[in-house]
Amino acid sequence: MANYTAFRVTPRGRLIPIPDSTVSVPTGSDPTQVLISPDQRLLFSTEQTSGVLRSFKILPEGRLLQSPNSPLPLPESEFPPGSPPPAHEPLGLQIHPSQPILYVNFVTINRLGVYSYERATGKLTFLKTVPNSGQIPCWIITNRAGTRLYTANTGDNSVTVYDLADPTTPVEIQRVTLNSNGSASATQLTLDPIESFLQVVNRRNSPNVTEGNGLHVLNVKRDGTLSEVSSSPLALPSVDDSFPQGIVAVDSKA
């Protein structure tokens, strides 16, 4: 059964389930991402198939307390009349680094959703959506200053850049189509520790086809816009019929 469960991480990296921390959700809800707030007191999630967002308060012992209006369906007003909830797919979350604002990709209508949240409880309030010229936006990241937001767009293998001068109203300022290395899709993305480069994972949906699996590297200019470096992408091999999914950049000196 689909659920959310909290774990303790030991100094050796073992995961130990926290008693009574499991929150079960209906079968077929398809939880896809969880994201902890900067103060580590709240947790937000997307459920792709059921078309809802969930928010939780993280209690001192690690258990999860669901927020007052959770689960919260995506607003019907943003979708074509009569479209069923399965077409209301949220995918990809990011929190503004200093403001109580949550960003959510509305995948099926190519828009970026903006929510505010209560810091004490995690209660979400829908504010608006803004357009994304990319197709099927899936993953989101912001820079540490909270001035730029980036989405990886699976449908057209691109990255969209937003200006966050007003964090509640992101404004698209660029869309970059990634260099082609076969039929593949942009998935997760990350910024390096000094935010000089943005990396994006490309993958094929089939583990039996490796052409197109790669790592794209884009230079981050002073204004936060992007340009892909000439050596990009780096082809990634398939190991045991796997494909790449997920990426993080760390400081090797840390």
Residue spans for each PLM region:
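Short loop/turn segments immediately following the C-termini of beta-strands
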Residues: 1, 9, 48-49, 58, ...
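Structural signal for beta-propeller blades
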Residues: 2-4, 51-53, 110-112, 157-159, ...
